[in-house]
Amino acid sequence: MENKTEVPRGGRRQRSRRPAADASSSKTEDKRQRMTPRKPRPIHRPWTLYAPPRIAEDPSVPLAASTFRFMSFNVLADYLVINGRENEPAKHHQKYDWEYRSVRLMKEILRWSPHIVNLQEVDHFEDFFEPRMKKAGFVGVYKRRTGENTHDGCAIFVKKSMFRIVSSHPIEYHVLDHPVLDRDNIALTAVVEAKNSVGGPSPARFVVTNTHLLFNPNRGEIKLAQLDMLLKHLTSLRKEHNAILPVLLSGDFNLAPHSPLYHFLSTGKLDASGLSRYGLSGQNLDTYALKKAARVNENDRTRHHGNGTAFGKFDSYRAQRDDFRVYKPNTVYSHELDFASAYAQLPDDKCTGEPKFTIFHSGSKATVDYIWYTRSSLHCHGVVEMIPAGLLFKHDELPTTEHSSDHLSLVADFSLR
């Protein structure tokens, strides 16, 4: 007799039911659902073009032979994340976990298809960044900070199909018996050569520099000394090569756009007579008005309006007490590098045109990261914009599950003149 499957009334086959889960498996499933975050999506950041050599909004469009993409990114050192997070709710722990963050940091770097990358706060160079970047076609150099209790540093990577590192030059800001240069901050400089130079008999060379200056907002005289040391080194390096090499300088400068130190970088001159160390970096400015404006107006076009004053207008930073003055109160500082800031747009008598934020956490919501370039020898074609301030204020702070650093990356396209 032929076996037939009995079909219940209605003509539909009944589905077998799973046995009821016991209490322990139910708890495990609930815990798994709580601990598994939704798949993060990258936050949209549009390009702003300064010149029309290519369609920057479409990263698949190939760059011209003489054009390259530069990225600077403070990746938030793992050991700094761990410190001070013990009392936070458990639901926040995963976004600080290195295995979780490391994957998303690499996605952020490779997302923009850069050719040269400067990273700050790198404390997993040999076991993570170097092998991962090598796999992506990069070669790099690294300099760790000099302190016994500091485990991070600066790294420079270049796409080896386009560039080679001719030489690298670490700079230590700690100088024995110096009255001010007594901190463990560092810089790293590399002379880079383009492999396929166009328009010249010899390969084009330029200088790439990465730095992370002191954070302390009250010790501006230390930052001024560090900055002065770095700029003198760059000037000397250019002379050693018997050429006016183009310079790209980026990093976490821990100074605001309205500050005397920003004025020094952008104009090449600073009269430090009587300036207060408390105000040199501009980090102590009350940003309440900026925060309020950011909440009210989320228009992308206002991203670069609201930070800073016009160049030179920092009279409020004059010292009121002798103990706040810089260690060389009558010194006029200068450099001849003729820097322009890649992100400064439409500066006027009220603002420098820098973004409102490049860092966003509970301790600081400000612009402290920059890409500087020698305007006579490099041309900036455009930049990737910051996340709108109104959107950032919807988060308590960075990092989030979508963005794994408390800094935003800076990305710009350049060509040699």
Q: Which ranges hold each PLM region?
A:
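Metal-dependent phosphoester-hydrolase catalytic domains
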Residues: 2-57, 228, 235-248, 253-417
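Active-site beta-loop-alpha substructure in enzyme catalytic cores
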Residues: 215-217, 221-236
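Short, acidic/polar
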Residues: 97-110, 365
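Short coil/turn segments at secondary-structure boundaries
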Residues: 83-87, 131, 145, 168-171, ...
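Structured beta-strand-rich core segments of catalytic domains in phosphoester-bond hydrolases
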Residues: 38-67, 107, 116-215, 219, ...
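Acidic/histidine-rich helix-loop elements
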Residues: 75-99, 179-180, 217
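Active-site beta-strand/loop signature of hydrolases that rely on acidic residues for catalysis
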Residues: 69-75, 104-129, 157, 190, ...
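Eukaryotic short linear interaction motifs
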Residues: 78-81, 126-127, 149-150, 198-199, ...
